[in-house]
């Protein structure tokens, strides 16, 4: 598990599904078995819940980003003052208390978010953005895509993470919205849409081709 201290009151935790399996859990268990998911959360919290490192006491706020390769959990302590103000940027705790969970109930919030993620199809996780990510197993799967994606206005890069290749396509310079959707449809004929973000790939993945992925594949593989 990777631990990053964002500031005095906030930690960012990231754990891959491989790490989760090493702890004796499966992806299906943490998505659909509330008890197992809660137990995993407490295991993670126990590792950081020390006075010297990050003493979790009282209400905390959590934010979960669940991806196909792991979980990113941001934990923030909510220090509540006598007048109801907090030290984490919320001016009035009563107005924002739905964003917080007592330390002994936070597992329920985690599980509800994981369950929602587990019920979603990956294609439904695309957001309205210029950057799309696709995954595939063999580099040969990229060749027919590269042959059809000859538009120089489309930026592309290639990453590898845990035996999967990830194609990142930036449609920001595409001429029209319709053309963007058409190109996306072409790529989806051969590759699988992924909810993995470019930021996570840059942080944990291996960069294979930083620029002009389609042009490079056509030149050396097609």
From Swiss-Prot:
GO MF term (any one): protein-macromolecule adaptor activity
Classification via Pfam families: MecA
Transmembrane region(s): none
GO biological process: negative regulation of establishment of competence for transformation; negative regulation of sporulation resulting in formation of a cellular spore
Subunit structure: Homodimer.
NCBIfam families: PRK02315.1-5
Domain notes: The N-terminal domain probably binds unfolded/aggregated proteins; the C-terminal domain interacts with ClpC.
Family the entry assigns: Belongs to the MecA family.
Function: Enables the recognition and targeting of unfolded and aggregated proteins to the ClpC protease or to other proteins involved in proteolysis.
Name of the featured protein: Adapter protein MecA
Organism: Lysinibacillus sphaericus (strain C3-41)
Highest classification ranks of the organism: Bacteria, Bacillati, Bacillota, Bacilli, Bacillales
Underlying gene: mecA
């Amino acid at each position: 598990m990777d631990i990053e201290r964002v500031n005095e009151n906030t930690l960012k935790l990231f754990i891959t599904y491989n790490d989760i399996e090493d702890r004796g859990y499966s992806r299906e268990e943490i998505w659909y078995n509330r008890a197992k998911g809660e137990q995993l959360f407490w295991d993670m919290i126990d590792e950081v819940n020390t006075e010297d490192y990050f003493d979790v006491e009282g209400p905390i706020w959590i934010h979960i980003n669940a991806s196909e390769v792991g979980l990113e959990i941001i934990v923030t302590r909510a220090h509540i003052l006598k007048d109801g103000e907090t030290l984490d940027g919320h001016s009035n705790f009563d107005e924002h208390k739905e964003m917080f969970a007592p330390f002994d109930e936070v597992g329920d919030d985690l599980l509800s978010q994981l369950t929602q993620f587990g019920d979603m199809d990956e294609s439904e996780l695309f957001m309205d953005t210029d950057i799309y990510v696709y995954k595939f197993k063999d580099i040969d799967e990229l060749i027919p895509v590269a042959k059809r994606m000859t538009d120089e206005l489309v930026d592309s890069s290639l990453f590898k993470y845990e035996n999967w290749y990830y194609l990142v396509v930036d449609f920001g310079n595409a001429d029209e919205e319709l053309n963007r959707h058409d190109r996306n449809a072409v790529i989806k004929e051969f590759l699988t849409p992924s909810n993995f973000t470019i930021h996570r790939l840059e942080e944990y993945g291996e960069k294979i081709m930083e620029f002009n992925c389609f042009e490079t594949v056509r030149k050396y593989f097609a």
